[in-house]
């Protein structure tokens, strides 16, 4: 990570689900110069991909005004959905992957598309669990939130609507 551009916000995110689906959580870290902010939240029943998406959404959604952002994640699902245009294609096709298959997590993809449109975002993929400090911190936050007591976790309403 190069901190040579003082006008760039560096965002990091990760998601986790135990059992997949099962209890889950996301973790996110924002860095702007010397300022660091962390976010996490646990959910009673969700999937790892929903939490990966929500980590990115939470990081980008916390930013005020239009920002230049480099978002680093170990989720190829998140990166490919945006960078390969999958999410926009699914959106244009009423959230269908093809004639027969619905796209998964349309609510989260819509939210991610919306927050990306508010900023100038570039994505960087890193391999998880390789000692990258911010990715490791996001992993700790996500897993901590997934393992938190159920009284600290919230319900993933859309997941429950879609999956009963």
Feature roles, as predicted:
Residues 2-11:
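Structured nucleic-acid-interacting core domains from mobile-element enzymes and related host factors
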Residues 3, 35-36, 80:
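Structured, active/binding-site neighborhoods that engage oxygen-rich ligands
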Residues 34-52:
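A short, polar/acidic, helix/strand-boundary loop motif
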Residues 10-23, 57-137, 141, 145-146, ...:
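RNase H catalytic domain
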Residues 22-24, 39-40:
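Short, glycine/acidic-enriched capping/hinge loops at junctions between secondary-structure elements
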Residues 147-164:
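Acidic two-metal-ion nuclease catalytic site recognized across multiple nuclease folds
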Residues 26-30:
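Short beta-strand scaffold segments in enzyme catalytic cores
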Residues 31-33, 74:
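Generic beta-structure capping elements
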